[in-house]
Amino acid sequence: MVEADRPGKLFIGGLNTETNEKALEAVFGKYGRIVEVLLMKDRETNKSRGFAFVTFESPADAKDAARDMNGKSLDGKAIKVEQATKPSFESGRRGPPPPPRSRGPPRGLRGGRGGSGGTRGPPSRGGHMDDGGYSMNFNMSSSRGPLPVKRGPPPRSGGPPPKRSAPSGPVRSSSGMGGRAPVSRGRDSYGGPPRREPLPSRRDVYLSPRDDGYSTKDSYSSRDYPSSRDTRDYAPPPRDYTYRDYGHSSSRDDYPSRGYSDRDGYGRDRDYSDHPSGGSYRDSYESYGNSRSAPPTRGPPPSYGGSSRYDDYSSSRDGYGGSRDSYSSSRSDLYSSGRDRVGRQDRGLPPSMERGYPPPRDSYSSSSRGAPRGGGRGGSRSDRGGGRSRY
């Protein structure tokens, strides 16, 4: 990369800032006829920058001067004299670093890719998903490395983020949600990519590649209920997805204002802080739930899976939020109870809900599902508000 500049041109470095062109010419003139002495100066201060270029008429003279003067002292400073290289050499020199730099990003990408890939691979199946999920999560974390930071903030729970990072592992393991929380988002991204895209972008980026929904879900599902859910999730998940996707849309549609506005408006805050995952999901799920409840069979398991997922979410969320944890749990619980009541009363879906969802989940699912609908807007919001104010 380094090309010699024109023959006879020498680079003189390490000069005393007091050394001027005349001094250089006097010193190097004894080796032969000098065509040009170029002392590099600072544009603003006009002071010597400590290096110069001396061009000899004869390349042989330049070689002699370089051989004799290199390392010699001039005006009290040892100078470096060598054949000048083209300026590109500088960029060239710098160039190599860039490759590393560029390489770095690729690495990052690779990491991301790996993460997604990992997730993706695993996502293919539940079991894998778990691993995948984990790996995913971890990959995510690793790929997300930077993200985590972002992630931390997003939760806006301050405390939670750290918790999340730590929990993410555990949480992940427990719910597989830690990583997944993001996933939930991923899902959101799925469902409401718009909403989350910002956030998701990071995670989703990973997630999406990951098939966030799937992997995550899978992860969730697999993790959450590895076996039962895995399969179920798997089968349903797609459905869920579909439903969810539609559900989301519907839920969004149902709660467009809410889904979007809340989510969007708060968008991410809420998503993060509140139930974005939970609420939104819940809502979405609810919507699904409802839509799903129509197909209870599917609905319940998925929803139920979903609810658990939600729960997971909540946990993850919680893990995520940490505060949210308590919050979500409390929230879910509170909500669940409140919501359940509200939702159920509002919805008058108690049976299906209860039936559809096991009680605990019920609370979650129903809460998530129930409330959102009836109380969804008001309830969930208030809940949200409450949750928020509470925390």
From Swiss-Prot:
An individual GO BP term: RNA splicing
Low complexity biased stretches: 323-337, 362-371
Pro residues compositional bias, start-end: 151-164
MF annotations from Gene Ontology: chromatin binding; identical protein binding; mRNA binding; protein domain specific binding; RNA binding; RNA polymerase II cis-regulatory region sequence-specific DNA binding
Crosslink feature (Glycyl lysine isopeptide (Lys-Gly) (interchain with G-Cter in SUMO2)) location: K22, K80, K86
Region (Necessary for RNA-binding): 333-391
Function: RNA-binding protein that plays several role in the regulation of pre- and post-transcriptional processes. Implicated in tissue-specific regulation of gene transcription and alternative splicing of several pre-mRNAs. Binds to and stimulates transcription from the tumor suppressor TXNIP gene promoter; may thus be involved in tumor suppression. When associated with SAFB, binds to and stimulates transcription from the SREBF1 promoter. Associates with nascent mRNAs transcribed by RNA polymerase II. Component of the supraspliceosome complex that regulates pre-mRNA alternative splice site selection.
Protein name: RNA-binding motif protein, X chromosome
